[in-house]
Amino acid sequence: MPRRREVPKREVLPDSRYNSELVAKFVNVIMRDGKKSVAEGILYDAFDIMEERTKEAPLEIFEKAINNIKPVIEVKSRRVGGSTYQIPMEVRANRRTALAMKWIMTYSRSRSEKKMSAKLAGELLDAYNNRGASIKKKEDTHRMAEANKAFAHYRW
């Protein structure tokens, strides 16, 4: 890791349809093998499915779903003396968003619907309604942090 100066973060250009940086970042999370147009197609199809099912603005559903999944606290391993402890740590804002997006993609890929856009729409709607596998992952993360509260004084 460089010690001289902090490396500047690259700017993410907002996407073309919704003019949102969050959507553009999520397209990058969906993308595999550099196929960005395929990833955009999947996300926009998922948004159309969500709009069809709920009659609400898909961007609002998406943003609320991401906010519902964002973890506040997580555990990190730290070696103290000869044993490893799981230490609860607060999650930084940009990591919260990144984790939420990663969890949505992981659990939407393991869903049973046929098309990826349907899987993604289903997971986003579940997250919007505070249910589903990605919400369970967030709750498990919080539960782990709560269980290891006794080791919070080992924080660095």
Curated annotation (Swiss-Prot):
One of its GO terms (molecular function) is tRNA binding. Pfam families: Ribosomal_S7 (PF00177). GO terms for cellular component: small ribosomal subunit. Keywords: Ribonucleoprotein, Ribosomal protein, RNA-binding, rRNA-binding, tRNA-binding. It comes from the Bacteria. One of its GO terms (biological process) is translation. PANTHER family: RIBOSOMAL PROTEIN S7. Belongs to the universal ribosomal protein uS7 family. One of the primary rRNA binding proteins, it binds directly to 16S rRNA where it nucleates assembly of the head domain of the 30S subunit. Is located at the subunit interface close to the decoding center, probably blocks exit of the E-site tRNA. Part of the 30S ribosomal subunit. Contacts proteins S9 and S11. This is Small ribosomal subunit protein uS7. It comes from Desulfatibacillum aliphaticivorans.
